[in-house]
């Protein structure tokens, strides 16, 4: 089973969009060969809340579009198949204000931008990063491939 706990602090995210994000992340989980049970949370916040989270936890006093907190980061590899418990991946926090601005800037829907940011955060939870050119190419390539195969394109 794959459990995603959604929380919308903004009241801007429609239920159908949550369903689409659930389907997208479930699709991505399969594409990333995660076969065991897993869970994560996705929280939607405004600019003030994400800036505060960014300041407190990342020492960056600025607004951003998405923040991920991976629970397995810097932990030894655990084979979750040996235990009858779900793999807890972590938390994804998405700023709806920034998502709206970016969707308008890029010329695609708010719904598409929320899906993009959720997948971006999900890949961070799995260990992908974009701190250097090679990692960025790998992560963004994977992200684009999953979005395109799922059918959530920029159109």
Swiss-Prot record:
Pfam family name, one: YbeY
GO-annotated biological processes: rRNA processing
InterPro entries in the record: MetalPrtase_cat_dom_sf_prd (IPR023091), YbeY (IPR002036), YbeY_CS (IPR020549)
First-level EC class: hydrolase
Cofactor: Zn(2+)
Gene3D superfamilies referenced in this protein's UniProt entry, alphabetically: Metalloproteases ('zincins'), catalytic domain
Keyword field: Cytoplasm, Endonuclease, Hydrolase, Metal-binding, Nuclease, Ribosome biogenesis, rRNA processing, Zinc
Key word Hydrolase present: yes
Protein name: Endoribonuclease YbeY
EC number: 3.1.-.-
UniProt binding sites for Zn(2+): 120, 124, 130
Cellular component, GO annotation: cytoplasm
UniProt superkingdom: Bacteria
GO MF terms held by the record: metalloendopeptidase activity; RNA endonuclease activity; zinc ion binding
Compartment annotation: Cytoplasm
UniProt record similarity statement: Belongs to the endoribonuclease YbeY family.
């Amino acid at each position: 089973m794959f459990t995603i706990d959604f929380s919308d602090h903004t009241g801007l995210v429609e239920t159908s969009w949550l369903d689409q994000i659930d389907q997208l992340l479930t699709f991505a989980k399969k594409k990333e060969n995660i076969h065991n049970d897993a869970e994560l949370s996705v929280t939607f916040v405004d600019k003030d809340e994400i800036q505060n989270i960014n300041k407190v936890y990342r020492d960056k006093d600025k607004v951003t579009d998405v923040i991920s907190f991976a629970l397995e980061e810097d932990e030894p590899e655990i084979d979750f198949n040996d235990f009858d418990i779900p793999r807890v991946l972590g938390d994804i926090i998405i700023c709806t204000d920034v998502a709206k601005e970016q969707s308008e800037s890029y010329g695609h829907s708010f719904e598409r931008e929320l899906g993009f940011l959720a997948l971006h955060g999900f890949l961070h939870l799995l260990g992908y990063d974009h701190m250097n050119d090679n990692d960025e190419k790998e992560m963004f390539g994977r992200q684009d491939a999953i979005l395109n195969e799922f059918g959530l394109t920029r159109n």
